[in-house]
Amino acid sequence: GPALLGLYYTSHILGHGEAVGKSSNCAHAVRCVKREFVEKRGLAPEQVMLTVCDADTYFDTQFMDCLAYTHVQNPKPYNTTYQAAETFFPNIWAVPILIRIKAIIDSVGFVGQLASPFSHPFPFAIYSQSLRTSMECGGWDVDIIPEDWHHYLKCWFKKDGDFGVVPVFMVMGNDAI
């Protein structure tokens, strides 16, 4: 059968005690994914990859292939968050010069941090991990706003420090604002 079952998204209505933001949205999405793909369709959590992104995220056409390849080649695929090489270039010529300069500096910095053997990168804005990893670490918290670092640290502590970011060197990103 096909290697990629499909791309899916969820729509989340804020519940009691939930903060507005990506973390509560991610928690909702994981509940939906577990219900639809694990409980109804019988897939194992190891067979499902989650990607967190923003509404203005653009993906390289080969990103999913590269992510899948990186995941299956990883000796510790369930102790990993995958981070793409994020840039802020889609609308770079439509923003004022100062924002353009900051977007270029940030883009170079993010890619450089991923490539550096001396850094310990944290996930930022657009990242992926297996459903199994999310379930083992307790998923995203609904009352947190900075979901990327919080969820990463939650996984890092749950796995006793045996958790890291693996770069996916496919360019993707968001609009510069």
Tell me the role of every PLM-derived stretch:
Residues 50:
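Short aromatic/hydrophobic "clamp" motif used to bind/position activated sugar donors
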Residues 166-169:
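A structural/positional concept
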Residues 53-59:
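Acidic metal-phosphate-binding loop of nucleotide-sugar-dependent transferases
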Residues 3-6, 11-44, 61-145, 150, ...:
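Long helical/loop segments within the catalytic core of UDP-sugar-dependent glycosyltransferases
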Residues 47:
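Phosphate-coordination loops involved in phosphoryl transfer and adenosine-cofactor binding
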